[in-house]
Amino acid sequence: MFVLASPDKEKGTLLELKGKGCRQMESYLLAQHRSWYDFLMDALVEGGVMKRLDLAINDMAGILDIPELTEKCNHEECVSVFRSFKSYRSGELVRSNEQDRYGMGNTLYIGSLKSEVYFCIYEKDYEQYMKYDIQIEDTKIKNRFEIRLKNERAYYAVRVKDVLLQLFNKIIGA
């Protein structure tokens, strides 16, 4: 959790929440009997500005095969309103153990990174391996699918409560 405050009231305060920070904030909100929606709406009512909002779905079973999804994009087998994609595979030049020979993970972006909406799909298990040295087979989350919303899109996703619910229902097929 990062909180950056400026003495200049016009600049306000920046709150940036990542994984553990989100869990800490969630505990705080639960203790207050508030939801993320309540918190975000309160921030907007107080004049807050949302620069980016990431909505994540964890793939615990390894359903998403990111290299295969990348191949589908390469062969124009992906049906989407987005017009572009980027795929990255990371690794090490000097491999310290046998497991590293397969690379350090794949990431697929669907949509322009400059647009207000794009998807990011990545191998979370490899990320955990690199950050915390957790063996890949021991990670609970295999992949992560994120919808990244910026500026107005982030604002309207929160402002119109049902938009988030409808979005997730479409993704999970409910």
Tell me the role of every PLM-derived stretch.
Residues M1-A174:
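Structured, helix-rich domain cores that form ligand/interaction pockets
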